[in-house]
Regions:
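Bacterial N-terminal signal peptides that target proteins for export
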Residues: 1-8
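C-terminal segment of classical bacterial N-terminal signal peptides
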Residues: 14-21
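Residue-level hotspots at or immediately adjacent to binding/recognition sites across diverse folds
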Residues: 22-292
């Protein structure tokens, strides 16, 4: 199995970033209508990826994770790696192929691809913890492995040939994860610096750009579409969590109206539909879909 490694130098990115806090929610660029999606009979559902047909990858169960693919109005197609103890389905492409990770009966995390109903384990050679977090239409998956010291290392796995592309970020002293890849080869993710601070990033057209939502204490990018619109979460100075969209050099804050201050956006498709989850006042985790 081939391994390719390259090093990206950090580039100081100059952008004029506009931060907007919106609840019900619109600005001059976006207007979303939110729908809550919960797995029947469960109080914990996360929606993590969405393709252009509106099929959604996710999982339910706080204690024991079980994966699914969801289509409206209420069709949950259960998807779990065979004989696994737990499964999270995270990325989905326009063919309906998915990726994610599963935990085996020994408690080990493995990445996986589900290509037309055929499951394949994806583990970086010599490692014991892998997760795949995003998948494009070329069957390239974004993910990471953890080394023996517990430090995460981001990579891209190309299913066509089984090639791993390792991404080395000099500032990522505390580790990094690749969370999404689009058909143009742009990559989203986040890294942890020497002070333990989380920063989002996007690699587009060979340029590495750090993403820090203005005034935040933590920023993590979780996905992107073919327009290089990036989504994720940030934590504000009060410790509240909000979703964001980064587009054309500008940030916009996004909260599901039912989960203001507890919202995470994990996926976005080319129709600018977003998926994620929020936590209710009662402690339940609800999935959501936002459409313009």
């Amino acid at each position: 199995m081939k391994k390719i490694e390259f090093t990206l130098a950090l580039v100081a990115a100059i952008c004029f970033c506009r931060a907007t806090s919106i609840s019900a929610w619109e600005d001059d660029r976006f207007r979303f209508h939110f729908r809550t999606v919960n797995f029947p009979g469960d109080t914990f559902t996360q929606l993590l990826g969405i393709n252009d047909s509106g099929t959604i990858a996710g999982y339910h169960g706080a204690a024991v994770n079980k994966g699914f693919a969801f289509t409206f109005p209420n069709d949950f197609d259960l998807e779990n790696f065979p004989n696994s103890a737990q499964t999270q389905v995270i990325g989905i492409n326009n063919r309906g192929y998915t990726d994610g990770f599963y935990i085996d009966n020994a408690g080990t995390n493995h990445g996986f691809l589900d290509i037309n109903g055929t499951f394949t384990t994806v583990d970086f050679p010599g490692t014991t913890l892998n997760q795949l977090l995003g998948l494009n239409n070329l069957e390239q998956a974004a993910g990471y492995y953890a080394d023996a010291a517990g430090i995460d290392h981001p990579y891209i796995f190309d299913h066509n040939g089984g090639v791993f592309l390792v991404i080395t970020i000099p500032a990522a002293v505390g580790g990094a994860q690749a969370t999404g890849i689009n058909d143009n080869g742009s990559i989203s993710g986040f890294y942890i610096d020497s002070k333990g601070t989380n920063h989002g990033f996007v690699i587009a057209k060979g340029r590495f750009q750090t993403l820090d939502f203005p005034g935040s204490t933590l920023t993590q990018a979780f996905g992107l579409n073919n327009h290089d619109e990036v989504v994720g979460q940030y934590v504000d100075a009060s410790g509240l969590t909000h979703g964001f969209i980064f587009d054309d050099g500008r940030f916009t804050s996004v909260d599901d109206p039912e989960g203001v201050g507890t919202t995470t956006i994990n996926g976005i498709n080319d129709r600018r539909q977003i998926v994620g989850f929020f936590v209710t006042a009662g402690g339940n985790t609800n999935g959501f879909v936002g459409s313009e």
